Amino acid sequence: MLRNIPRSLRKDGGKRIPGLISRVANQFSTTSSLLNKKSIPDAPEDSHTGQYINTITKPFTVTTYARPNVVMTHGKGSYLYDLENRQYLDFSAGIAVTCLGHSHSKITEIISDQAATLMHCSNLYHNLYAGELANKLVTNTINSGGMKEAQRVFLCNSGTEANEAALKFARKYGKSFSDDKYEMITFKNSFHGRTMGALSVTPNEKYQKPFAPLVPGVKIAEPNDISSVEKLISKEKTCAVIIEPIQGEGGVNAIDAEFLVSLKKLCVDNEVVLIYDEIQCGLGRSGKLWAHCNLPEEAHPDILTMAKALGNGFPIGAVMVSDKIEKVLKVGDHGTTYGGNPLGSKIGSYVVDQVSDKEFLLEVEEKSEKFTKGLSKIANKHPDHIGEVKGKGLLLGLQLKGNLDVGDVVAKCRENGLLVISAGMNVLRIVPALNIPNEAIEEGLDVLDKCIDELSKDPKSSFSQS
């Protein structure tokens, strides 16, 4: 067992760190039970984990995250394992990313084979897989009943990068009418990213205030209130409206279909680009290929952004545009060095095949029903502490209330081998792998039930060690 992390690591330029990490990873096995039976509080400062974090991680990484004393070392399917050989059932999937689970065998094979063949060649040249991925995205989207005017795809590396591209494309479309047509409308409780353009349409003071002033011309409307949009939209000035069909970070809020139909009509009447951000709710997460597949064609977007699940953990994003957007874009208007690289594109192509499959999507809906029934049962047991079950598919939330704090629930669940995350105003968010086994759903719900039961009796209690 690793007893100490040498002080000399800081004096040798980090040359010995890779070897240390390798030794640490190799000395722990995955022989623990399906879910640990005992409480597993976060590792103390003098543990292997504490030493690693305080000696290697914290001194050399920017302080932008508040993280518990947990160092993940490996994962398989719906389970993660840490440096202390603790096992966790993952109901978070890396924030709705690992849609096919951790260390998926086929994706591992694709990564290995393609890395040995060609990882990157830039967009100065074509490669074998970028066009294939774009073709599959457009074809499967139309065949699934989504974005009826889907035409072309821009490949990039992340969700915020996809939204930046979408906003640029919308600005270019607006300028084809007038230089004054540059304003954008976003919605309360939305989240579109942290780079400057995406941040500007993410109306959360916590994220925006430290970096103001932001991109000018952004108006904020109320979701599900079409009159609030009518007051802001202008044929002369507005170029884009951006919205998540199901808000994730903002609280797992599904937007009403009637509102989205009316919103699209407003956009058409005012020659405004409608952007759907399906970075979290898309690619099978809602039980359909896209969340907007549940909507009539009259509510379909002009631009669709995606990322997260597209690479199952490998960084990749994409922007799908209609013909009217494609027509205003010229060579040199936008670009990316890494976007559409052969490795990411080949992974994305495989993921799209899986999440477009009708049987796969039916199973997502069945798992959603199982989750919803279980969560409703928990909610009914605790009417003073749980309001409603929110969301669609496997993007679900529990609205907490009373003295039950979502941070306490997240910590309590983690201590008992279950990973969940928060969203919005005191909402517990559940976004597991789309292929999570039914028995894992049941076991995770049992842990969640016990944790909420104990916290509802004593919000600051510790889960039983027995």
Curated annotation (Swiss-Prot):
Catalytic reaction(s) noted? N(2)-acetyl-L-ornithine + 2-oxoglutarate = N-acetyl-L-glutamate 5-semialdehyde + L-glutamate
Gene Ontology terms for molecular function = identical protein binding; N2-acetyl-L-ornithine:2-oxoglutarate 5-aminotransferase activity; pyridoxal phosphate binding
User: Which domain of life does the UniProt lineage start with?
Assistant: Eukaryota
* Entry keywords, A to Z: Amino-acid biosynthesis, Aminotransferase, Arginine biosynthesis, Mitochondrion, Pyridoxal phosphate, Transferase, Transit peptide
According to UniProt, this protein's pathway is: Amino-acid biosynthesis; L-arginine biosynthesis; N(2)-acetyl-L-ornithine from L-glutamate: step 4/4
Cellular component, GO, one term: mitochondrial matrix
Q: Tell me, what is an example of a GO biological process annotation in this record?
A: L-arginine biosynthetic process
N6-(pyridoxal phosphate)lysine: residues bearing it: 308
The subcellular location is:
Mitochondrion matrix
Q: Which cofactor does it need?
A: pyridoxal 5'-phosphate
Q: What is its EC number?
A: 2.6.1.11
Q: Write down the CDD domains for this protein, in alphabetical order.
A: OAT_like
Sorted alphabetically, which Pfam families does this protein's record hold? Answer: Aminotran_3
Q: What class of enzyme is it?
A: transferase
NCBIfam families (UniProt xref): argD, PRK01278.1
**HAMAP family noted in UniProt:** ArgD_aminotrans_3
PANTHER family given for it? ACETYLORNITHINE AMINOTRANSFERASE, MITOCHONDRIAL (PTHR11986:SF79), AMINOTRANSFERASE CLASS III (PTHR11986)
Q: Which family does it belong to?
A: Belongs to the class-III pyridoxal-phosphate-dependent aminotransferase family.
State what protein this is by name.
Acetylornithine aminotransferase, mitochondrial
